[in-house]
Amino acid sequence: MDAARPGHRAPPATARELTTVARLRSVPRVAASLALAGVIGFAVAAHADDGPTADDLRAALAPGATLRVDGQPLRTEILRDFYTSVDFEPVWGPDPDGAARTALALDALTGSRDHGLTPAHYGVPALRRRAELPTAAMALERELLLTDALLRYAVDVRAGRLRPTAVQPDWGIPPPDREDPVHELAQVVVAGTLGAWLEALPPPHEGYARLVTALHALHAAADRVGPSARGAVDQKVRQVSVNLERWRWLPRRFEPRHLVVNAADATLTVIEDGRVRLESRVVVGDELHPTPVVRSEVGAIVFNPPWTVPTSIVVDEFLPKLRANPRFLADNDIAILDRRDDPYGLTVNWAAVSPDHFPFRLQQRPGGWNPLGRMRFATPNRFDVYLHDTPLPELFQREDRALSHGCVRVERARDLALLVLAGQPAGRPEALDRALASSTTGVVSVVRPLPVYLLYWTALVDDEGRLQLRDDPYDRDARVAVGLARNPGTTPRPAGGPATVSHQPAGAGTHR
């Protein structure tokens, strides 16, 4: 493997890869026999250099089998599905094509650390030990372990090791498909395109590739520094690894024209055809009201919007103020909807109002200190968060801008409106300014809805190639880091004696 190559992505095969199933069948055969010893073990005959045979694999993957290698559980049903697709012929055999495929697979698994993954989670130490102990039994174990590991790696590097909602409940973007690519792997083995397939597995985004390069450099630095500096480098490694995982949870393609808010550094960027069209500082949710991760679209802009107060704010903030000052609503021009005879609740006994069953809807009229400012960008989503203007522009001068109840306040709201409405009559500067100067609420539909991604990056690489680390205002990184570090199964123990592939009849034991 070329250690100087960032990402350690598997290169195209240097030896010809297998091109037909018939070529797979040309791998030399080795006799196999079954031996019963508590569990049914597979004692593969001599001639280890020949590798396992199709008969060995059929026996190992017989219905009802439960396979473990050095205590590492293998996914028998998935392996059986894969080997059925290739007529149970070995894939990682000692022939030139099998050796070339093995090199590609091991290069990808070893290079997984530059994607923020852990090679040991894919059995790399166990695989290398088996290469050093070339017995027939070891060859069979290596065949099965490598296939299982490569299928797991393919899912992890393409769609993420973790399910996003398991570590961040307010993740609202559907994650990529996590189905094992059993038939994909079989097809590329037969077609001789394993190297190209491995290259195409990670997310194709430039932001992801930049972080891979940065992580490669951090690993190199960690190998050079002394123990006193190692902790700081390791922390950066963890932070970059967490953000690579977040990239893997995202769609593999963004629309050519889209808007991204990074809640971790409170910035907004509009990108069109690969170019930055607009950048703006924003205010995002505070620690108690974090801005969620979600995709939506700007489908309309509301000028001079009223503010319907969310129930959580009414109960947690307004009700205590009303109990202390019954004129609070009148003083702030907030009315109770559908209560014309007493719009400010001056006759309400607020002390008797239960926070669990608040009976009123409150709305602040447009203008003045309305917290939505002069415009709201309608972005329907299940979290009911949106982008809007603000009457407090001084907040954008603060370094810490995690201050809102979850919605996103945009410093350059007028410029964003002009961009969103470009090509529409309402998007002409003079028309927009007239709408803003009016005290009347108006709604303009957007002809070309703008996709909006509210995301969360605490590590990114800028256009000059510099790694930029951000604070973690919502303390989200730690849970992702813990999940990534967790071993998906039992770590294979060192090979100290004859290792076996064990086969347990159905019902003899379970593994969850």
Task: Describe each PLM feature range.
Residues M1-S26:
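N-terminal secretory signal peptides that target proteins for export/translocation
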Residues T14, V27, A46-H47, L140:
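Exposed, low-complexity/repetitive linear segments and helix-based recognition motifs
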Residues A31-F42:
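Bacterial N-terminal signal peptides
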Residues D49-P174:
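Cationic-aromatic interfacial patches
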